[in-house]
Each structure stands twice: as structure tokens, then as C-alpha cells.
């Protein structure tokens, strides 16, 4: 039964990791540089499933080492190499996630395939440094026991502690601290979420004229239109009472309809006066004088009066309301689209980080009993000896 279960796990490991490598190498959407970590990690797991687990299974079932002693030494070194590489890969992936979340703009520009390959090479070098000492320095092995040969890990205390710290405890501590830091960053950004949803980003504030309460959603358009109608009625009333002065530009310091304490509206930068409201073609066919809503005749707030003029995209509309200047149609779509793309990218990063945290948590729980009992045997071999079956 044990042999059947282990054989199934071997085949499942090979098949699943081969699919991961195939997906990353053939799918365009998965060709991001950071996915090279997954390719290297999958390769390490395949090597464990093909070169390590079958011989371990044979050793457990037979009760002794059936193969040559030279292969036993190579087998133990490869065991430490591949398992250490797998764990350190997860540590490198967690650091990559942390840099991608905490230094998004700076790190994404540096996250090139060359840089990722250098990190992967460093991971394999660390694993090699930990796994090669038993091959180079064999130490005092003592008299060989008679009877059936055995293939066991190095029993010297210094190597047990050094390899356990380098292979598991240090990477595990780094991963826990890194994911704790990522969680705090995600929690802080979540607390800022309501404010971010109520107003656009800095770049979008410039595009929308820094509206005092942010760009309105489609649900607020009826209220926006009613305010606009009220503003136009006030403008027509001011024309009939002679309050509007012909020929004045927004740059004029004595603009009527605006309190003297408010700064004048800036020019459009092209030497021409910007229309803040552009009516429909049917209305423009009528009286042009009545269809134009001059900025100085609309009672605007100080925040919108101080804001720069709108850079109106082609085919978009500009509305002047009591709450500031707002771009409609394609203008709003462009600004909000960029904002939502950034939000979607951050959401994907958080989701991927959560999945990796679950995988790493399960991985750590699976490895912890072995490394704990392995290290405990080196610290107090007489009084803290772990039973062979449990080990």
C-alpha cells in the first residue's frame, strides 16, 4: 500500500511539474520574467521525484541500501541539493513578491529575465554549497557495521546544524518575515481603499481638472445634469440683467460673477478661451450666444477656480458644475480605465501572494518535523533521541 501511494505521488509530481514548465514556456500570458522561478522550482521537484524518492522508497522497503556505496554518497548529496534548492526557491519567490509589492515602479523596471536568471543561479549555488561538504570532507566515519549496508545522512553535529539552518530554518524565517511585511502593506492599502475609490489618483486629478469631490460615476450623472441646468439658468439670468460683460476673458482680474478674493481662471495655454460646456448639435444650431456657458458667469467653487484648464481629449465633453470641471465620454473612460488597470494589477499581485503564502505554509509544515528531529539528534543525541520510525 505504501509503495502504491508513493508511486502515485512520484507520477503526480512529475506530471504536474511538467505541465507547469510547459505552460510557462508555451503560453504568452505566462512569459513574465518572474515565472522563471516557477520553471526552476518545477525542475528541482521533478529531479527529486525521479532521482531521490525511488531510491528512498527502495531503501525503506528493503531495510538496507541495495545499491553501491559510491551511489549512496552521490544520492545523499543530490538529496540535500534538490531539497535545499526547492526551499530556497520559495524564499526567492517570496522576496520577489515583496519587492514587487513594496517597490512596484522601481523593481518592475529592474525585473528583467537576466536579473531573474542571476537570482536562480544564486539559489542553486547556495544549495550546492550546503550539499557538497559531505562529498569533500567525509570525516571520521568509524567502523562500518557488519551485515546489511546502510545509507544514512551525515551524523556530525556541525554539519547537521549548519545544513539545517541553511536549508530550512533561515529560509523559513525569511519567508515568514517577508509575508508578514506583505500582509501589513496589503492591510494598509486596504485601509486607504475607501478614499482611493472616492477620488482619482494624482495623474487623474490633472486630467479631470482636480474636481473637488473626484470624477463622478454614471450613477451621479442625473444630479450632475440638474446642477448644470441650474448653472445655465443662472447664466441666462445674469445676461438678461446685464451682469455679464462682453469681451472679457478668463484671465481678466475683474471677471464679473467671481468674487475678487478668488484667483482668476488660467488660460488654456493656446491663447484661446476654453469652452467649459459644449452643447449638443441641435442646441448649437440655435443662438450661439445663449448656448455658450462662459466660465466667469458660472458660480464655481474656489477649488475649481484655482484648477488648471482641462486638456480635452478628442471626442470628449467637458461639463462645468458647481463641483468643478468634469470630463465625460472618452475622457473619463481613459482616466478611469488607467486607474482600474492599476487596481486590477494590484489585485492580481495580492491574489498571487496569497496563493504562494498558502503553498509555502503547507510546504513548511511538511518539512518542519524532519528538520526539527534531525537537528534535535545533533543537539542532544543521548536524551533527545527520536525513534527511528517517527524519524
Curated annotation (Swiss-Prot):
Residues 233-247, 271-281 have a biased composition (Basic and acidic residues). GO terms for biological process: platelet activation; regulation of smooth muscle contraction; regulation of vasoconstriction. Its main location: membrane. GO terms for molecular function: alpha2-adrenergic receptor activity; epinephrine binding. Residues 295-309 have a biased composition (Low complexity). The record marks 163, 167 as: Implicated in catechol agonist binding. Residues 194-218, 233-312 are annotated as: Disordered. Disulfide bonds join 72-151. The chain crosses the membrane at residues 1-25, 37-62, 73-95, 118-140, 157-180, 356-379, 389-391. The record marks 79 as: Implicated in ligand binding. Residues 63-72, 141-156, 380-388 are extracellular. One of its GO terms (cellular component) is cell surface. It comes from the Eukaryota. It is a multi-pass membrane protein. InterPro entries: ADR_fam, ADRA2B_rcpt, GPCR_Rhodpsn, GPCR_Rhodpsn_7TM. Residues 282-294 have a biased composition (Acidic residues). Interacts with RAB26. Interacts with PPP1R9B. Interacts with GGA1, GGA2 and GGA3. Belongs to the G-protein coupled receptor 1 family. Adrenergic receptor subfamily. ADRA2B sub-subfamily. This is Alpha-2B adrenergic receptor. It comes from Erinaceus europaeus (Western European hedgehog). The lineage of its organism: Eukaryota, Metazoa, Chordata, Craniata, Vertebrata. The gene is ADRA2B.
